[in-house]
């Protein structure tokens, strides 16, 4: 029983430390890459994408689309310098799950990005893109 209590305490301590470490790190930051420019990433550098078929407050990516494009969600979004926390929000998807938004648009990962800093989802099918905060949302072509 004593070993179980010690083990449980250890788990709680580790959980507490990891929560503190994650809380100290902004949930969304700006990264930069030559040839691509600035773009949004999560706290550990995984690239965030937007889908040009989405509209503010509504996701068009469902079913098989989500297998390649997992949603990004943080209950509370902290941001690094250069970003405004009020630009982030949450939408409720048709399946009842939550998704974080940037300036109203849903945020996603790309399943083929294998490490932080990867941007393999950029330009896929000419509808998936990284998000440059200075140029987002893009102006419609008239």
Regions inferred by a protein language model and the residue ranges of each:
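Bacterial N-terminal signal peptides that target proteins for export
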Residues: 1-9
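Hydrophobic alpha-helical segments of integral membrane proteins
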Residues: 9-20
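Compact beta-sheet-dominated domain cores in extracellular/mature segments
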Residues: 18-142
């Amino acid at each position: 029983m004593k070993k179980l209590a010690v083990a449980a305490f250890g788990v709680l301590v580790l959980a507490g430390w990891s929560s503190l470490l994650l809380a100290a790190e902004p949930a969304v930051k700006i990264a930069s890459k030559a040839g691509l420019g600035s773009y949004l990433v999560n706290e550990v550098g995984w690239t965030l994408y937007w889908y040009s078929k989405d509209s503010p407050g509504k996701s068009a990516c469902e079913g098989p689309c989500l297998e390649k494009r997992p949603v990004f969600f943080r209950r509370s979004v902290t941001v690094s310098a250069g970003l405004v926390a009020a630009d982030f929000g949450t939408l409720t998807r048709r399946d009842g799950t939550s998704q974080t938004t940037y300036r109203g648009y849903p945020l996603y990962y790309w399943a083929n990005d294998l490490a932080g800093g990867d941007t393999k989802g950029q330009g896929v099918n000419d509808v998936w893109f990284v998000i440059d905060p200075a140029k987002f949302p893009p102006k419609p072509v008239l």
